[in-house]
Amino acid sequence: MVAQSTKYDHLFSNLIPNSIDGIKIFGMDDDYIKPQIYDDVTNLENRIWSELYQNLELLLNQYASREYLLGLKTLPIPNNMFPNFKEISPLIENATGWTLLPVAGFLDEELFFDINKKRQFPVTDIIRRSPRFDEKYSEMEIQNKKGYTPEPDIFHDVQAHVPFLMNADYAEFIWKVGVLGDEIIKDKRMLGPDLISHNLKRLQNFAWWTYEYGLVKNNGTSDRFRRVPNDIDYEIYGAGIISSLDEVNNVVDCAKERSPNSKFLPYDIEEMALTCFDYTHIQDRYYIVESMDGLYDSFKKNKELFFFEGQ
């Protein structure tokens, strides 16, 4: 695990101490690989999956991005039972070269980026509000609601993230994020531990405000893939929103001005990298990128932002 330093935290806004505190984290030295034993999935777990999926199905069809809708359509992700990793992984590999890696839970930065640069995407087969989830967190408190949990469960990993891996441009983008994270950690520029920690926080913030909680401008061209036209100005591409009924409803309510809970801000990669996040609550802001191509291009042109050398 990368040593944590607060030396440059004064550069951040919205600073949240221990932003992922309270989640079990696995590292290189842990037994982090945990194959899915599909025959062990219980009827209760299938029912939980089904309820989560069906609660979100119509909302996501109306408000999720085109990349998500097309990816979901091509994968065997059922709405009434757990998905089988062995059925999904070969299809993704054939499409974009990525594979699924079954893991025990949340991974630390070093392990996550090492896996990512190999085009492996970590997935778990534990699900919120299940006995296995309760057992994992029997000795520590964690939010465990149907609408939201900070633990990356199978619903978040597979239902929300995995469909995007069928899109070649998106898959290349998150691979480049992984490569950059690995480069920061290996510190070939010899910046030292304080700046490694700081630059990783910048990259984590960027990832949070984009592929976890990002929105893209709705230009109307995705409606042909929907049952009901999107009636707000944005499409959802952040997996943290997609897997959370509470978060999706918040986006829609705020976009329709039924709630003042969150604000919509224009995409600004420097501001995003320097703005910390709070995983324990519904997000108070969402950044809007003009297009997915704009996101990819911005990241490509601004990598030096993640190699801050101190001041």
Q: Model-predicted segments: where are they?
A:
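The feature captures two recurrent sequence modes
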Residues: 1-169, 284-311
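C-terminal structured domains
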Residues: 2, 6, 10, 227-228, ...
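Non-catalytic, well-ordered alpha-helical scaffold segments
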Residues: 86, 171, 175, 201-208
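Short coil/turn segments at secondary-structure boundaries
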Residues: 103-107, 171-174, 189-191, 220-223
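Surface-exposed beta-strand edges and their flanking turn/coil or helix-capping segments
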Residues: 115, 170-173, 188, 192, ...
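A structural signal for long, well-ordered, hydrophobic/aromatic- and basic-residue-enriched core segments
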Residues: 157, 171-177, 181-186
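Extended, Lys/Arg-enriched charged tracts that mediate electrostatic binding to polyanionic substrates
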Residues: 180-238
